[in-house]
Amino acid sequence: MPFGWGRGRGRRRKMRMIRFPPQVRHFYPAIPSVGPPKPPIIMTYEEFEALRLVDYEGLTQEEAGRRMGISRGTVWRALTSARKKVAQMLVEGRELIILPQGNEIVRDEK
């Protein structure tokens, strides 16, 4: 077993390149929903960046992967998760908070 790969550790996550961190990181409904409050939805910078590059900038998943330093498959998973979270936020009227995971390299190019 290679050094640093102890039991239960799994594979180390690659660093992700984030070119434009979100300017607004917390979204919430203007009118609270009826009933008990639901927990907020958490979106990662990786999911946000994949959504921004593919749906907003119009890049292919392969191009987005190159920009982020990850595989096209990882972009696909992040994009699918981000789209589901945005839909869930809109349909259920829940808060959405965008947070870093700690494995991002933020390169703000404003």
Swiss-Prot record:
Organism encoding this protein: Pyrococcus horikoshii (strain ATCC 700860 / DSM 12428 / JCM 9974 / NBRC 100139 / OT-3)
Superkingdom of origin: Archaea
InterPro entries, sorted: RNA_pol_sigma_r3/r4-like, UPF0251, WH-like_DNA-bd_sf
Similarity section: Belongs to the UPF0251 family.
The protein, known as: UPF0251 protein PH0803
